[in-house]
């Protein structure tokens, strides 16, 4: 019977340098998967907008912008919908700027 190694355990043949890089890549992949799951909303349109941001901007976004994006994910869907569609102005300036940037991303 073959024993499987636990998830996240590094094969012994990897050098220390490769091990650290592998772990960092795995951590980033795991974080991105969890973030993509958080982006799933009750509305397909919001799913598409947030997914577009993850695909096109997240990797190169500065930490401050990432923090604003995470703050947006904590907002209620109905508020997000009204802000993204322009029915209401977002009261937070940083959120409003990121919403405008996300709306401007190509489909």
Curated annotation (Swiss-Prot):
<dbReference type="InterPro" id="IPR036714">
    <property type="entry name" value="SDH_sf"/>
</dbReference>
<dbReference type="GO" id="GO:0005737">
    <property type="term" value="C:cytoplasm"/>
</dbReference>
<dbReference type="InterPro" id="IPR005631">
    <property type="entry name" value="SDH"/>
</dbReference>
<dbReference type="InterPro" id="IPR050531">
    <property type="entry name" value="SdhE_FAD_assembly_factor"/>
</dbReference>
<protein>
    <recommendedName>
        <fullName>FAD assembly factor SdhE</fullName>
    </recommendedName>
</protein>
<keyword id="KW-0963">Cytoplasm</keyword>
<dbReference type="GO" id="GO:0006105">
    <property type="term" value="P:succinate metabolic process"/>
</dbReference>
<comment type="function">
    <text>An FAD assembly protein, which accelerates covalent attachment of the cofactor into other proteins. Plays an essential role in the assembly of succinate dehydrogenase (SDH, respiratory complex II), an enzyme complex that is a component of both the tricarboxylic acid cycle and the electron transport chain, and which couples the oxidation of succinate to fumarate with the reduction of ubiquinone (coenzyme Q) to ubiquinol. Required for flavinylation (covalent attachment of FAD) of the flavoprotein subunit SdhA of SDH and other flavinylated proteins as well.</text>
</comment>
<dbReference type="Pfam" id="PF03937">
    <property type="entry name" value="Sdh5"/>
</dbReference>
<comment type="similarity">
    <text>Belongs to the SdhE FAD assembly factor family.</text>
</comment>
<keyword id="KW-0143">Chaperone</keyword>
